[in-house]
Every structure is written in C-alpha cells, then in structure tokens.
Design a protein with these regions (language model features):
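N-terminal maturation segment of proteins
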Residues: 1-181
C-alpha cells in the first residue's frame, strides 16, 4: 500500500525497496519486524536478569533513577566531559576496536548562550567533508550555569548522567568518527 498523501511515510513498497537496495537485505518487512521484536525481547530479558542479579529485583528505571540522583560529578561539567571523552577514545584506541583517522581533531566546548535552547544536553557539529582540517565540535549544554540555587544547579547537572555513553555516541566511536573518516 502507498503512504497517505502529505505523509512522511514511504509506504510498504518503497520501504521494502530501501531495505533491499540500501541495506542489501533480502528480508521482507515482516521478517525485519519479527527480527527487531525478537531482539527487543532478548535484550529486555537480559535487562530483567541483570536487574534481578545486581539490582535486588528493582526495575531498570528505578536503578537508573537512583544512580542518577546520587551522581554528582567532581568539578566543572565541561572538564568532566573532556576527560570522559578522552577516556572513552583511549579505550577504543587501546582495544583497536575502530580506526582513528590521522589528524582528526575534536574540541569539547560549551554551547554558546544564544544556542542553549537548541540542544538538550549535548550535540556534535562535523567539519565539511573536504575541509583540510577535520575538526569536529562536541557541544556540551551546561544549563546549570544559568541557575542560581544549588538544588537547581545540581538538577541540571544530573541531566548529564551517563556521560560516557554520550561521549561514545557523539565522539568516539560515534558521530565524530563517522564524519571524519
């Protein structure tokens, strides 16, 4: 069936074609959906087992919520991001899990005040594909700088819980390596 007029959806026929042509998969849409649902169930089961083993049977949401509420980074948030981004990159380098292009450069910077409303916590800006200097920018939005009370500042900083995952997503092996290689 075709997608409804003025819809962003492709419709089943075009989506099937993209699965084949762009991903090189000879799966039907039904097979793709079944595989995705099966994988979601498998990972969900692993999460339940891990919560039972390490979280005394609590839900993942409550375990993560508790960890977030107890997380207080030491020092300046931007510096914490810089250190963690370097630590994550070093881990991938040491493991030789991905290749790092010669001369790549990543700067971790605060989001400018006039752009704070555009980024929830962090974002990445890539260099142009033909720029000689392949410098990317990993933007950190520290909204605690705009708060006055200690409780408000802490609440904003705790939105950044999971910095290592954010660094992996935005920098190494994430968007930065994706765009500079």
């Amino acid at each position: 069936p075709l997608a409804a007029k003025n819809s962003f959806a492709l419709g089943a026929n075009r989506l099937q074609r993209r699965v084949h042509d762009e991903l090189g998969l000879d799966y039907t849409l039904g097979q793709v959906e079944a595989l995705a649902l099966s994988e979601a169930d498998r990972i969900g089961g692993l999460l339940v087992k891990a919560c039972a083993k390490y979280g005394q049977g609590q839900s993942a949401e409550s375990i993560i919520g508790k960890a977030r509420s107890e997380w207080v980074p030491e020092g300046d948030l931007l510096e914490v991001y810089r250190k963690e981004t370097n630590r994550v990159a070093s881990g991938f380098r040491k493991a030789k899990a991905v290749s790092f292009p010669k001369g790549d450069e990543l700067q971790v910077r605060l989001v400018p005040e006039f752009m704070r409303h555009l980024y929830p916590t962090a974002a990445y800006s890539s260099p142009g594909p033909f720029e000689k200097r392949q410098r990317g920018i990993f933007w950190v939005n520290d909204l605690s700088l705009a708060k006055s009370s200690a409780a408000e500042k802490l609440s904003e900083v705790q939105q950044h819980f999971g910095i290592s995952l954010t660094a992996a997503h935005e920098a190494y092996p994430g968007h930065h390596l994706q765009f500079v290689t």
